[in-house]
């Protein structure tokens, strides 16, 4: 092993850390830097006693001051031939991380790194020379920087469930690596009620300028000045000091449709939040105070990434109850209307994609069921009707027939033209018919 160590010093000039991590799986309770220095000290004492000046020069070149001290003309220390001096700068890298994270609120973090092939090749050749299988530089660097950041910020590293991931990328440059901070998003779930018509669910970019701003949109970049997403998101974004947000909901209602009752499930994803511990009851109250005439939220609670998929799935399996204000082309006898509505219950509707959404939906026939159809108010040529429908059934076209694209329709069955003047979603139910 002594000859192997001399050969390793000659070929690779390893720093204490790189030499130590070659034996990183031997003994516990020692840092690799301590292991490497201990090996060099042993070699130095042996070489000094036996008068091996060449070995002492190799050790001095690798940074062992004790070896340099006994030489008349010691060589200057040179950078490590394996890590190229990177592992001597872990304190500096830890300071960079601490400076970047000091204003962020988080419970745990993890340090990661990416390395060029030349470094991995050099360490492998060092291990082959020594006849050992050592600890990779990636693991050493990540651990040592992490330990120092823990001390600097008084926080703990948490590789399994970190709020923050810090990544150094040494592939472009060992001297000036790229540095990335990935902050785990915050997920807030709940339900929203839209109390005023004319508000889209999500931000609607101007179709002429595609969000850039033009006279058509009064240079806002938006077709509508506000949306459910923005009204809720602006309060949550400020509360968590987030850079931006994404809105995920269980389906959507038309702009001119209100969302009432128990509300529509949603998840707000807050990106790069500087705060993580916020009282959601207080935020719920703040949202309802600020925008409650238009939009309200209920049941806000912390969620997780899986909730995004769940809320999307919910839109595919959840029935909705609607209240529709219907205008007929001429008065329809009440008994006939009640008979038609009774016949609609449990009916399967064949509905070709409505003309009004053909620009954004595939033109195909969907088969959906009407589970309930009840007359609430009647006044000759007007009526208020409640429908309980499968997800994805277009209620406006169920009423009008959409020029024969929806069959059967209310208009077809009463043999009078019919249109939906107003529409509300009044209940959001799960796939079993219970409230979600």
UniProtKB/Swiss-Prot annotation:
Upper classification of the organism: Archaea, Methanobacteriati, Methanobacteriota, Methanomada group, Methanopyri
Catalysed reactions, as listed in the record: uridine(54) in tRNA = pseudouridine(54) in tRNA; uridine(55) in tRNA = pseudouridine(55) in tRNA
SUPFAM superfamilies referenced in this protein's UniProt entry, alphabetically: Pseudouridine synthase (SSF55120)
HAMAP family reported in the protein's UniProt record: Pus10_arch
Gene3D superfamilies with a match to the protein in the record: 3.30.70.2510, 3.30.70.3190
Entry-linked InterPro entries: PsdUridine_synth_cat_dom_sf (IPR020103), Pus10 (IPR005912), Pus10-like (IPR039894), Pus10-like_C (IPR048741), Pus10_THUMP_arc (IPR055174)
UniProt GO MF annotations: tRNA binding; tRNA pseudouridine(55) synthase activity
Keyword Methyltransferase applies: no
Protein name from the UniProt record: tRNA pseudouridine synthase Pus10
Binding site for substrate: 322, 394
Keyword Hydrolase among UniProt keywords: no
Function: Responsible for synthesis of pseudouridine from uracil-54 and uracil-55 in the psi GC loop of transfer RNAs.
Signal peptide location: none
């Amino acid at each position: 092993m002594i000859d192997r160590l001399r050969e390793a010093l000659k070929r690779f000039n390893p720093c204490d850390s790189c030499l130590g991590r070659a034996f990183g799986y031997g003994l516990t309770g020692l840092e690799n830097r301590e292991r490497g220095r201990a090996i060099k000290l042993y070699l130095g004492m042996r070489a000094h006693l036996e008068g091996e000046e060449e070995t002492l020069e190799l050790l001095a070149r690798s940074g062992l001051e004790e070896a340099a001290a006994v030489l008349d003309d010691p060589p200057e220390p040179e950078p490590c031939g394996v890590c190229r001096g990177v592992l001597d700068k872990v304190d500096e890298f830890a300071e960079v991380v601490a400076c970047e994270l000091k204003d962020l609120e988080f419970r745990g973090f993890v340090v990661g790194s990416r390395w060029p092939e030349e470094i991995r090749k050099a360490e492998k050749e060092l291990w082959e020379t020594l006849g050992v299988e050592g600890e990779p530089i990636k693991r050493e660097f990540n651990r040592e920087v992490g330990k120092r950041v823990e001390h600097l910020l008084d926080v703990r590293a948490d590789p399994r469930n970190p709020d923050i991931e810090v990544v150094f990328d040494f592939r472009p440059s060992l001297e000036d690596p790229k540095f990335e901070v990935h902050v785990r998003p915050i997920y807030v779930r709940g339900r929203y009620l839209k109390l005023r018509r004319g508000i889209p669910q999500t931000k609607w970019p101007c179709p002429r300028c595609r969000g850039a701003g033009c006279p058509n949109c009064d240079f806002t970049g938006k077709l509508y000045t506000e949306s459910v997403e923005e009204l809720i998101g602006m309060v949550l974004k400020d509360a968590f000091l987030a850079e931006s947000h994404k809105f995920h909901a269980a389906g959507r209602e038309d702009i001119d449709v209100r969302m009432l009752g128990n509300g529509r499930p949603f998840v707000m994803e807050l990106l790069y939040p500087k705060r993580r511990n916020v009282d959601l009851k207080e935020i719920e109250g703040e949202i309802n105070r600020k925008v409650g005439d238009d939009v309200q939220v209920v049941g806000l609670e912390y969620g997780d990434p899986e909730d995004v998929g769940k809320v999307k799935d919910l839109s595919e399996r959840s029935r909705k109850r609607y209240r529709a204000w219907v205008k007929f082309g001429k008065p329809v006898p009440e008994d006939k209307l009640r008979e038609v509505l009774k016949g609609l219950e449990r009916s399967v509707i064949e509905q070709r994609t409505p003309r009004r959404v053909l620009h954004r939906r595939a033109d195909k026939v969907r088969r959906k069921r009407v589970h309930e159809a009840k007359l609430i108010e009647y006044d000759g040529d007007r009526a208020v009707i409640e429908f309980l429908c499968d997800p994805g059934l277009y209620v406006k076209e169920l009423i009008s027939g959409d020029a024969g694209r929806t069959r059967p329709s209310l208009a077809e069955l009463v043999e009078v033209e019919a249109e939906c003047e107003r529409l509300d979603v009044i209940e959001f139910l799960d796939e079993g018919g219970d409230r979600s």
